[in-house]
């Protein structure tokens, strides 16, 4: 067993927006280590966001992430041969990770032509409290509410 918990590594802020959250989005979008391609996708998507909304892209993106981040999630716990979905609070770090993961996942599943358009529209939708990523958050919260009776099984 470990003696100490490993230290969390901080990602560097991206050069254009000077934001760690944007760097995390770049890392979430990136496939096969192609960071340059991921950066160009995100910066182009942010340009589209600015054109469509007329607001700074970083502001819209931060609002989208805040809207998507879940407060409660379900964890499966086995008690006496039965599996229970136990609602648990989400740590701030995990909330951010889940928010970014859901935005990238549902952007990829959209039916626009390019990933740039898909990501831009998913960010705009999330900032307006609509879209698939918001629906995922609401479904998670609904399931947690339905399983509230098992909250005493928390560990």
UniProtKB/Swiss-Prot annotation:
One of its GO terms (cellular component) is small ribosomal subunit. This is Small ribosomal subunit protein uS7. Gene3D superfamilies: Ribosomal protein S7 domain. CDD domains: uS7_Bacteria. NCBIfam families: rpsG_bact. Part of the 30S ribosomal subunit. Contacts proteins S9 and S11. Belongs to the universal ribosomal protein uS7 family. Signal peptide: none annotated. Pfam families: Ribosomal_S7 (PF00177). It comes from Ureaplasma parvum serovar 3 (strain ATCC 700970). It comes from the Bacteria. One of its GO terms (molecular function) is rRNA binding. GO terms for biological process: translation. One of the primary rRNA binding proteins, it binds directly to 16S rRNA where it nucleates assembly of the head domain of the 30S subunit. Is located at the subunit interface close to the decoding center, probably blocks exit of the E-site tRNA. PROSITE patterns: RIBOSOMAL_S7. Keywords: Ribonucleoprotein, Ribosomal protein, RNA-binding, rRNA-binding, tRNA-binding.
């Amino acid at each position: 067993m470990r003696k100490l918990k490993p230290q969390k590594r901080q990602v560097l802020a991206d050069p254009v927006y000077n934001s760690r959250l944007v760097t995390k989005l770049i890392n979430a979008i990136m496939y096969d280590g192609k960071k340059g391609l991921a950066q160009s996708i995100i910066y182009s998507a942010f340009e589209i966001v600015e054109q469509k909304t007329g607001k700074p892209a970083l502001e819209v993106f931060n609002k989208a992430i805040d809207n998507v981040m879940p407060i409660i999630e379900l964890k499966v716990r086995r008690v006496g041969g039965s599996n229970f979905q136990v609602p648990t609070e989400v740590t701030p770090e995990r909330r951010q990770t889940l928010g970014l993961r859901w935005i990238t996942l549902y952007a990829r599943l959209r039916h626009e032509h390019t990933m740039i358009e898909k990501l831009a529209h998913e960010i705009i939708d999330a900032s307006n409290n609509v879209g698939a990523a918001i629906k995922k958050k609401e479904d998670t919260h609904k399931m947690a509410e339905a399983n509230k009776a098992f909250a005493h099984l928390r560990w």
